Amino acid sequence: MTAVHDGVRKQALRTKSSHTGKRPDWGLIGTAIDFRLRLVFTTDDLVPVSARRGHAALTRNHPEAAALLGELTAAIASLLAEAPPQSADRIELPESSENDLLRLCVVAGQLDQLYRSYLHVIDKTPLLDGGRAVTFDQARAQVPWFVIDQLHDQVCLANTGLGELRARAGIARSGISFSGSDSIDGADADLLVDGLFLDFKSTHAATTITKSDVYQLAGYALLDFDDEHHIDHVGIYWTRHGIKRTFSLPGFFELLGATETVPELRAGLRVELAAYNEQRQRARDAARNAAEHRETADAEASRESGEEIPVRRIHQTPRWLSRVFQR
């Protein structure tokens, strides 16, 4: 059961014949179309902060990747600067330019993956080859055509799905964070256009707003504790369907059964998160103190007995070992 049901049904884009049989990385495709559609509305952040952080993580272990971010940023800027003028409601660039831009968005998406889940993706990221970081030209060239086809189809749909919004857009920002973002270890939203917070979904499923979607929209809106971004509408755009659904912020919470105003809900969430984080910090402090107490007791027992510490135990207590070396 979903909290909000719009009754809209529109078939999603079909997978093209360029599929080679290998399971596509749908998450990467979703991230790349997100980044591409952000560039439709604002070019203030050519490479999203999450991708920049992923590059920083990659460079720490592979310093030869240092130039990748600068070259990626410069390539996006150059491509957009050279694009021919288009009507205000036009999303898609000429085919060759569009495909080139999509390749760059995929590379940015691969960097984003390193930020989101470094340990899980570092062994399979295309940004490494034989244990070394690939060059920017290699990263761009190796993006599969199947991925480009999938993304290009979604950009074509956006001509009608987002064209009107783009034509009348005034102030747009992407990858925004909120005053409450740090309270949940970071949260950044896709796009804010003239007070409309819009989240992109690249799911194949029907365009029904699921419970998790509702929680996400509500959470982002309420994390703007101080109304810094002046959000007055929230919505979802389904990239594979070309459908957008929006709600006024008060109306959205009324649909969810809220009996308090948005400012009251924000104040309540701020108090709840502060209490939760305080409790979590106390638990961390207690665990750290207990661990330090155990390490001290172990070290004293070892000195008194004069026995060697088993190798297995040393591996289990790296913090204790580092202190021994310091002494």
Locate each region found by the language model.
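Residue(s) in the substrate-gating loop at a strand-loop-helix junction
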Residues: M1-Q154
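Metal-dependent nuclease catalytic cores in nucleic-acid-processing enzymes
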Residues: Y215-V234
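Domain-level recognition of nuclease-like catalytic cores that cleave nucleotide substrates
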Residues: W238-R327
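Short, conserved active-site entrance elements at the starts or edges of catalytic domains
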Residues: F146-S179
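Active-site-adjacent loop/helix micro-motif of nuclease/hydrolase catalytic cores
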Residues: A206-Y215
